[in-house]
Amino acid sequence: SDFDKEEIKRKCSISTTLVPVVWGKNKINVLDTPGMFDFVGEAQEAASAADAAVIVVSGKAGVQVGTQKAWELCEKYNLPRMIFVTEMDQDDVSYREVVEQLTELYGKRIAPLHMPLRENGKFVGYINIVKNKGRRYIEKDKKEECPIPDYSVEYLEKYRETLMESVAETSEEFMDRYFGGEEFSVAEISAALAMNVGDGTIVPVCMGSPVNLQGVSNLLDDICGYFPDPSTRPCAGINLNTNEIFEANYDFAKPKSATIFKTIVDPFLGKYSMIKVCSGVIKSDDVLYNVDQESEEKLSKLYVLEGSKPIEVPELHAGDIGAIAKLTATRTGDTLSTNCLLYTSRAHETL
């Protein structure tokens, strides 16, 4: 997603970019933020619009200050999260050490879902801890089932025990079964994990090598399987006409409202205001009211952004992320809504 000349030169992100990904029946709006601590403001903007987060940790460097800052942002915005340990294809990378560092910081909330298989120091596959099965890569992300090697059994049992404890804590019935020595089915484990990830009591750890596309499909499966439906997350502000709380909650049927979480000014792209639609369906040529600037804005064209590529769309639905071109008075942090609503998310934050 890095397209800026300076990003290409540095070989790292310096600003947030939107990368929509369609995976199965789901659309995932990925806000790819810089990992360097120098650009933490970009991550703050993205976190304010996100419904969940994936914290990327270098398998070589391990947990760093940026990792902890990203975790703190997730805590601030109450975001469900998972951790993706990258660079597993590199020599001398220890997934186990990264998991130990994370566990030392965040305790029993850390729960690995996968662990790597290595032969002669090379990353050749992984063990799915939920399914208790091994997979060997045969070509990039293509894989086949394989036996679990003896050298992996000790840590597999340790990581699996952590998962089973989390499953047991979701209900009295499961707790009784756990202490009775009963096994949980894969479906029961997955359902319990989704509940625990949603409320933040469990933070899954995945791993792979995006350069080789290894582990990417697993990550997308885990995002769709374990992160909560955004419509279940509260999204509210103040209706200034009534001075009452307006629960937007990403409802298509409610009056239109959206927040501006980032402004892009590019010599080639021009000025774009990136928006998260909180309720209703926003269409090009809508006239919306900016409560913060006390002015109306007539929308022109709407876009979804794929990195540096703007794609024009006729409308954006509640819960989606997109961009509006050439707003005049609107700034980052402002709220747009219909006149009948006069919705502001800022006012709600001050309650």
Label every PLM stretch briefly:
Residues 1-346:
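Structural and coupling elements of P-loop NTPases
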Residues 347-351:
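A short, hydrophobic C-terminal helix/tail in secreted or cell-surface proteins
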